[in-house]
Swiss-Prot record:
Protein name: Large ribosomal subunit protein uL10
HAMAP family cross-referenced by the UniProt entry: Ribosomal_uL10
Family note: Belongs to the universal ribosomal protein uL10 family.
Keywords of the record: Ribonucleoprotein, Ribosomal protein, RNA-binding, rRNA-binding
Assembly description: Part of the ribosomal stalk of the 50S ribosomal subunit. The N-terminus interacts with L11 and the large rRNA to form the base of the stalk. The C-terminus forms an elongated spine to which L12 dimers bind in a sequential fashion forming a multimeric L10(L12)X complex.
GO MF annotations in UniProt: large ribosomal subunit rRNA binding
Known role: Forms part of the ribosomal stalk, playing a central role in the interaction of the ribosome with GTP-bound translation factors.
InterPro entries per the UniProt record, alphabetical: Ribosomal_uL10 (IPR001790), Ribosomal_uL10-like_sf (IPR043141), Ribosomal_uL10_bac (IPR022973), Ribosomal_uL10_bac_type (IPR047865)
Lineage top rank: taxon: Bacteria
Lineage: Bacteria, Bacillati, Cyanobacteriota, Cyanophyceae, Synechococcales
Length: 175
């Protein structure tokens, strides 16, 4: 028995809400994945503030219809698709998908969409290679701390050098 019109409209509404909250969408070919493996993927994504939805391409097409930010996703809507919708830390979500794919060797990323632009496989891998927000903040804090330390050492060195010169002069060595 197929879904009722109300059920389909509800799914399209949920997809529209998820898309409105998402920054990045990945389209995966999930053919061959077991229910256990899909549950594993969903658990991994949940930790990275992402969600994996399996829905008919026609329902996703209806959800993106008229939305210029997501309209380019239409070209990826063929075959059996799972949609990974990532909000927040996109790098963590992409890393979770890639780690899952590396372990299972069953699913394949067809492509993605970020800020209205279709992403190739290489661009998706580049996003995964980016450091997380926390790592960037730590690097910046380390750089700022290093500069402050160098300034403090430099300021401290001036009186120390002067004191050594005065001591040497007082001991009678004019070199």
């Amino acid at each position: 028995m197929g879904r009722t019109l109300e059920s389909k409209q509800q799914i399209v509404g949920e997809l529209k809400e998820l898309l409105a909250e998402s920054e990045l969408a990945l389209v995966l070919d999930y053919k061959g994945l077991s229910i256990k493996e899909m549950s594993d993927l969903r658990d991994r994504l949940r930790a990275g503030n992402a969600v994996c939805k399996v829905t008919k391409n026609t329902l996703m097409r209806r959800a993106i219809d008229g939305d210029s930010a997501w309209s380019n996703l239409d070209s990826l809507l063929t075959g059996t698709n799972a949609f990974v919708l990532i909000k927040g830390d996109v790098g963590a979500g992409v890393k979770a998908v890639q780690a899952f794919q590396k372990e299972t060797k069953k699913s394949e990323t067809k492509g993605g969409l970020f800020e209205g632009k279709l992403l190739s496989q290489d661009e998706i891998k580049a996003i995964a290679d980016l450091p997380s927000k926390e790592q960037l903040m730590a690097q910046i804090a380390g750089a700022i701390n290093a500069v402050a330390t160098k300034v403090a050492v430099g300021i401290n060195e001036v009186p120390s050098g002067l004191a050594r010169a005065l001591k040497q002069h007082a001991e009678g060595g004019d070199s």
